[in-house]
Amino acid sequence: MANIKSNEKRLRQNIKRNLNNKGQKTKLKTNVKNFHKEINLDNLGNVYSQADRLARKGIISTNRARRLKSRNVAVLNKTQVTAVEGK
């Protein structure tokens, strides 16, 4: 790339944004793992809000956020059904 000030600034911005986006995705993965460790509505709410926030910012696609939420709700419903059947 040519040594143009605007290109150098753009490169700095891209690096900073890339690091921020990676951190946000890591937080989402951590929230999903925490949900799977202890399945409850509080953890599901964290996953929902994080996924919606990242989709709104364009860090993940809206379809990916919807898919993630749908799969986690299915896990929650499955555990609730087995808990009721076990009683």
Curated annotation (Swiss-Prot):
Keyword rRNA-binding among UniProt keywords = yes
Keywords, A to Z, come to: Ribonucleoprotein, Ribosomal protein, RNA-binding, rRNA-binding
Question: In its UniProt record, which GO terms are filed under biological process?
Answer: translation
Q: Which InterPro entries match?
A: Ribosomal_bS20, Ribosomal_bS20_sf
Describe the function of this protein: Binds directly to 16S ribosomal RNA.
List, in alphabetical order, the Gene Ontology terms for molecular function in this entry: rRNA binding; structural constituent of ribosome
**Protein name, entry field:** Small ribosomal subunit protein bS20
* Pfam hit, one: Ribosomal_S20p
Q: Which family does it belong to?
A: Belongs to the bacterial ribosomal protein bS20 family.
The record's Gene Ontology cellular component field reads: ribonucleoprotein complex; ribosome
Does Amino-acid biosynthesis show up as a keyword for this record?
Answer: no
